[in-house]
């Protein structure tokens, strides 16, 4: 069982009077910020018997812990250090006679992250009263992750405890809310933030050029369903910038239906969707799903090929980021970074060392008309100036 510091000192001072007794010291992680950035940092746990058979050859001991997810897992080799020790001679009674030599231990290396502590604290605060969600703050110039928060979360120190309370254990591993799931890297319906993809499909195909004006309506019928405008009225005749500003559904239904599913799919791939982003935490990352006509023909992943054709209702849903579109918040942040930086896909990363390495790498250009990207930027600027996002801007945001 664990000894108090006082008992440990007394025992070590009188160690020569005891025989057949050994003090086992265990190194544990202490996380002073508890749940802050839990999914990013990750946790450690003891190695299993099967793991020990392999890891013992790398210097691990049977009671060692190993990183399981997040930074703790990715940078295990950098963080763990190496054990030292002392060889001693004892007599038949187990009494120490002399030291035969020592091998100094080596501490692990520091791993510096790109995370801004104040920004991370702010992201966690925003999510505090929410049932679930994720927030990512990324530098669009180079992909450095400044904040990454996921809710629900958990206290990292739980995994450092020798004896884990059953109630907390069950909450973490068996709760329907799945607090161990990193929602920043899991795929969901994106909703209205997807409308930039539909807009670019209209612009890049030339079917809906930059001067396009469309009549928005209370409702537009596709197939057997009436797809409504979110204000149930419409916004009159508007173009791209105003459509983004007010987040019009019926504007983007018309664009999406006009260009078709495969044009939207093509643009989405240029923006990095349906693929891993390259972040170090790729084992937690989901590629997501962007529908295509070929995907529908093959059975949509669950049906019989040829029996689940593409229908008009699908394109309406896809145009505004619902149902047949599943993307991760990280993918979305990367796509928006490409809009902001003039058309370059950056590699998201949390390691400061990787940030320096990426400076010498050639940037990947998405290959879209700069004028079209400018239209999207103008529309997004209007969102927070006088649109659906105006409530977050109290004059404190400097808009580029």
Each predicted region: which residue ranges?
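Periplasmic/cell-envelope proteins involved in peptidoglycan metabolism and beta-lactam response
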Residues: 1-164, 187, 262-270, 388, ...
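Beta-lactam-recognizing serine transpeptidase/beta-lactamase-like catalytic domain environment
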Residues: 90-102, 141-193, 197-400
């Amino acid at each position: 069982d664990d000894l108090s510091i006082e008992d440990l000192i007394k025992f070590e001072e009188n160690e020569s009077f005891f025989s057949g007794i050994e003090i086992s010291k265990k190194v544990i992680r202490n996380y002073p910020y508890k749940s802050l950035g839990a999914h990013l940092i990750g946790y450690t746990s003891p190695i299993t018997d099967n793991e020990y058979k392999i890891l013992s050859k790398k210097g691990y001991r049977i009671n060692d812990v190993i990183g399981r997810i997040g930074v703790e897992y990715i940078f295990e080799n950098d963080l763990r250090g190496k054990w030292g020790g002392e060889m001693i001679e004892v007599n038949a009674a187990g009494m120490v006679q002399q030291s035969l030599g020592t091998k100094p231990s080596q501490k692990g290396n520091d791993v510096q992250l790109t995370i801004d502590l104040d920004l991370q604290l702010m992201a966690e605060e925003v999510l505090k009263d929410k049932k679930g969600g994720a927030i990512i703050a990324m530098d669009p110039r180079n992909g450095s992750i400044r904040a990454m928060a996921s809710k629900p979360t958990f206290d990292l120190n739980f995994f450092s405890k020798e004896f884990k309370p059953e109630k907390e254990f069950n909450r973490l591993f068996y709760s329907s809310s799945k607090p161990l799931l990193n929602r920043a890297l899991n795929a969901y319906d994106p909703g209205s933030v997807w409308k930039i993809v539909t807009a670019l499909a209209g612009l890049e195909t030339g079917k809906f050029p930059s001067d396009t004006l469309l009549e928005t309506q209370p409702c537009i019928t596709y197939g057997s369903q009436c797809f409504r405008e979110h204000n149930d009225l419409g916004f009159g005749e508007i173009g791209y910038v105003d459509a983004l500003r007010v987040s019009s559904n019926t504007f983007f239904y018309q664009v999406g239906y006009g260009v078709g599913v495969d044009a939207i799919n093509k643009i989405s791939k240029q923006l990095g969707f349906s693929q891993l982003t390259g972040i170090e935490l790729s084992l937690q990352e989901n590629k997501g799903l962007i529908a295509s006509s070929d995907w529908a023909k093959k059975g949509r992943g669950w049906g019989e090929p040829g029996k689940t054709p593409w229908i008009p209702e699908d394109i309406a849903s896809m145009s505004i980021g619902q149902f047949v579109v599943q993307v991760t918040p990280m993918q979305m942040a990367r796509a928006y970074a490409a809009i902001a930086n003039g058309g370059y896909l950056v590699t998201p990363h949390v390691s400061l060392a990787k940030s320096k390495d990426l400076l010498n790498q050639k940037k990947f250009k998405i290959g879209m008309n700069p004028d079209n990207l400018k239209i999207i930027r103008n529309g997004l600027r209007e969102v927070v100036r006088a649109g659906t996002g105006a409530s977050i801007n109290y004059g404190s945001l400097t808009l580029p």
